[in-house]
C-alpha cells in the first residue's frame, strides 16, 4: 500500500518494510492524549456504504506510550467529508492473550461511533454490548474482516468461523456513505497490509 493513496488525519503515515513486505505505518500526530478521536489514515477517493473490509494489522507500543496504552488499532468506515462522523472498530492487543486481568480481558475489542458514542460514553453508562474478548497479542499480524450491511456490522478476527462482535444497529444512519480509514489511538505504532475491499453497492 503506497502512502500516496492515503490522507493523514491527525496522523503521520509512512511506508515501512516488515519481513520483506512493504506495509503502511500509521501513528498519531495530533490529539495525542485524546481517546476515540478522528485519528486515522484515510483512503483517498474511497466511497464505502455496504460491503466487506479485510486487512491485516500489527500493533506495537511506542517507546513513550503511557501505562494505559493498549495497542489500539483498527478501522474507520463511512467517514464523512469533513471527518466529523464515522463508524469504527478497533482491538486492544494488550487485553488479549497475555492479559491476566479478568476485567481488562472483557475489553478486548470495541465498536464506537464518532463523535458522541465513544468507549467512555458506553463505559459511563454500563453498556458492554460493543466489546468482547480477543485472542491476540502485540507484534503479531491480526486479520480483520468487517462485513457492513445497512445498519448491521459483523466483525471477525484471524479467519475465525464465528464473529467476534455483531452490532445489529450501528448508531449513524444506515444510508451513510464515506471513506475507509486505518484507525490508531494513544501510544500505538500501527502497521497495515493486504487491504481488500468488496463493495456491495
Predicted features and spans:
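Extracellular glycan-recognition regions
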Residues: 1-201
Amino acid at each position: 500500500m503506497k502512502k500516496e493513496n492515503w490522507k493523514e488525519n491527525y496522523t503521520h503515515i509512512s511506508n515501512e518494510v516488515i519481513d520483506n513486505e512493504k506495509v503502511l505505518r500509521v501513528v498519531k500526530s495530533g490529539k495525542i492524549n485524546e481517546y476515540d478521536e478522528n485519528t486515522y489514515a484515510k483512503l483517498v477517493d474511497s466511497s464505502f456504504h455496504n460491503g466487506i473490509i479485510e486487512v491485516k494489522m500489527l500493533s506495537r507500543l511506542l517507546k513513550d506510550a503511557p501505562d494505559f496504552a493498549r495497542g489500539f488499532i483498527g478501522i474507520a468506515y463511512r467517514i464523512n467529508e469533513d471527518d466529523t462522523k464515522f463508524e469504527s472498530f478497533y482491538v486492544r492487543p494488550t487485553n488479549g492473550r497475555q492479559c491476566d486481568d479478568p476485567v481488562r480481558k472483557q475489553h478486548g475489542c470495541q465498536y464506537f461511533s464518532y463523535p458522541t458514542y465513544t468507549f467512555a460514553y458506553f463505559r459511563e453508562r454500563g453498556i458492554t454490548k460493543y466489546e468482547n474478548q480477543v485472542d491476540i497479542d502485540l507484534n503479531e499480524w491480526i486479520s480483520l474482516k468487517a462485513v457492513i450491511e445497512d445498519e448491521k456490522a459483523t466483525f471477525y478476527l484471524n479467519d475465525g468461523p464465528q464473529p467476534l462482535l455483531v452490532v445489529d444497529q450501528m448508531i449513524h444512519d444506515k444510508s451513510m456513505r464515506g471513506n475507509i480509514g486505518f484507525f490508531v489511538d494513544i501510544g500505538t505504532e500501527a502497521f497495515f497490509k493486504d487491504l481488500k475491499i468488496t463493495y456491495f453497492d
